[in-house]
Amino acid sequence: YDIDTVRTEIAKTDDAFTLSSKFGTPKFYNIKDICFGAKRAQQGSSLSLRELMDIGMFLREVSGLDEWYSQCSGIQTSLTEYFEQLSVNKHLENMITNAIISEEELADSASPQLAAIRRSIQRKSLAVRERLDKLIKSQSTQKYLQESLVTMRDGRFVVPVKTEYKSEISGLVHDTSATGATLFIEPMAVVEANNEIRVLQIEEQKEIERIIKEMSELVGSFAEPMINDYEIV
């Protein structure tokens, strides 16, 4: 390092200490490297929920840093030019943080369409369960069942039927127990409703993919300022 570079770095450190003494130290949490994800989005790729979450958290950190620096307005330091280069994007930050619950799940609030689809799935699933609950509680049916419960196989509601009684419960066989003593049968009475739920689940997945694509496109359009922010921070 030449002497000017050393002096500049010392000045930055001194100024950072001075600002922190006056206004408190800005809080930094676990900032992930968002450059790779930002560049992928810029090239048209859909990002994973994990990548989007990291970008949302990074944007929140930039917002926090910008808010902290707003207290220091009017104070010129060797750090001023860096703070003034920060690009805050509250719209994208809020869109991501409000839409994503975890790296595996989007919130219902991610879009009105997603919320509506999920309400329909919930309503139809409840109706199927109620119908099957009546079936398994019926005295005439209980003797055919291995257990009085409703379970799931391949995303469809089924009941566990003793193999020797399979002809007594009209329906579609989806699975067999390891011992072969139990068949998991989807009673014909709920096949159509289960089909409707499956169609809704496909619609739900398509809507999730659309939302992720939309957020990724916004990330892509803001990639350069974000990468610049990352290099500053």
Give residue spans per PLM region.
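Non-transmembrane amphipathic alpha-helical segments
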Residues: 13, 96, 121-124, 128-131, ...
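Internal alpha/beta scaffold segment
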Residues: 188-214
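Intracellular alpha-helical coupling/juxtamembrane segments of multi-pass membrane proteins
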Residues: 121-124, 204-211, 215-233
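Ordered, soluble secondary-structure elements with a strong preference for glycine-centered loop motifs
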Residues: 25, 49, 115, 119, ...
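Coiled-coil heptad-register positions
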Residues: 21, 70, 136-139, 208, ...
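Conserved amphipathic alpha-helical "coupling/scaffold" segments
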Residues: 1-113, 117, 228-233
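SMC-family hinge/dimerization module
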Residues: 149, 153-184, 194
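Extended, Lys/Arg-enriched charged tracts that mediate electrostatic binding to polyanionic substrates
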Residues: 115-165
